[in-house]
Design a protein with these regions (language model features):
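Repetitive helical segments and hydrophobic/amphipathic motifs
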Residues: 11-14
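N-terminal alpha-helical modules
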Residues: 20-138
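N-terminal signal peptide c-region/cleavage motif recognized by signal peptidases
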Residues: 16-18
Length: 138
């Protein structure tokens, strides 16, 4: 019966996961092995993405308020929310394509995830700044 063998493989994999998922000291990323640098770059992108996701509802609320105000006198201009959503979707496509292109120079290598995640983190931070700027200009 293959079930005990499959369970043994799953148990073996489960034992190796904690070692692979160790906490790397990202403050000293230059002295980490490639796997650690890749992990730190991914974590950096995730932090940037969480910041963007925290800013997003604030900008959406502000845009909805602007649309409500515009609808009273200029209903044809009450399209801020739709425009914001369209722009964000286009930006995600741009970010993913740009970062894949940057990483493509390192296809097949262990450096590719590092380059792609650095790129995603940088572009995501920039986009978050752009979104927050919209709150100041409103």
């Amino acid at each position: 019966m293959k079930t005990p063998k499959a369970l043994a493989v799953v148990a073996l994999v489960a034992l190796t996961v904690p070692a692979a998922a160790q906490d790397w000291d990202c403050d000293d990323a230059g002295n980490l092995p490639q796997q650690g640098m890749n992990w730190c770059a991914y974590q950096d992108w995730q932090r940037a993405d969480r910041a963007l996701n925290a800013a997003w509802p604030l900008v959406v609320d502000a845009m909805n308020a602007a649309d409500a105000f515009a609808a009273e006198s200029f209903p044809e201009q009450a399209n801020g929310h739709d425009s914001l959503l369209k722009a964000q979707r286009a930006w995600i496509t741009y970010r993913d394509g740009q970062c894949t292109a940057e990483g493509a120079r390192f296809a097949g290598g262990s450096l590719r995830p590092l380059i792609e995640n650095f790129c995603k983190a940088a572009l995501t931070r920039k986009r978050t700044e752009e979104l927050l700027l919209m709150l100041e200009e409103g």
